[in-house]
């Protein structure tokens, strides 16, 4: 994949479900599909049961980021920012997961956000087995909205729990359209 640095993309703070093992293989899920992603000799490899089209869209691979950044001219500082961000792709994440992760991220650090999101998925997401490991899909808004009050306490997300529940209820009842 051109212009894709998986470490920069997964570690820049835009997503919280990808974790690298000791060999640099990232394991995670997107749209309920588990995957393993790694770089070897400058090439990115992906192992998943999901259709290639889904991953192309998820990693936004059909967008020419080099062409976009070539259009910016702002001096030395902007050039250094563009160079630093080279290889980062804007992930086309599932809207509900992105919203929920955003709520969790308020006044939080990446390590804690990852922990809360992981507990959310393990507690309320559907298990999916892949390559001998169990992954958890991100729970749907409908699943979260149907929970009893206090059920999110297990996440240890503090004051964010009612906001997660409120957002889930709005998505589930259609008053918040994430595709609008």
Predicted segments, located by residue:
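HhH-family (HhH-GPD) DNA N-glycosylase catalytic core used in base-excision repair
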Residues: 1-180
């Amino acid at each position: 994949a051109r212009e894709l640095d998986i470490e920069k993309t997964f570690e820049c703070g835009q997503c919280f479900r990808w974790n690298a093992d000791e060999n640099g293989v990232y394991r995670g899920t997107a749209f309920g599909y588990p995957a393993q992603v790694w770089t070897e000799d400058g090439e990115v490899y992906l192992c998943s049961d999901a259709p290639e089209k889904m991953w192309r869209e998820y990693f936004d691979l059909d967008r020419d980021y080099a062409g976009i950044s070539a259009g910016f001219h702002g001096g030395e500082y902007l050039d250094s920012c563009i160079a630093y961000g080279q290889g980062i792709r804007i992930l086309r994440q599932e809207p509900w997961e992105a919203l929920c992760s955003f709520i969790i991220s308020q006044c939080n650090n990446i390590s804690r956000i990852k922990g809360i999101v992981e507990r959310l998925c393990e507690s309320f997401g559907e298990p999916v087995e892949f390559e001998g490991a169990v992954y958890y899909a991100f729970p749907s808004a409908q699943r979260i909205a149907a929970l009893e009050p206090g059920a999110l306490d297990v996440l240890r997300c503090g004051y964010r729990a009612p906001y997660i529940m409120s957002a889930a209820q709005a998505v589930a009842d259609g008053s918040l359209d994430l595709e609008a």
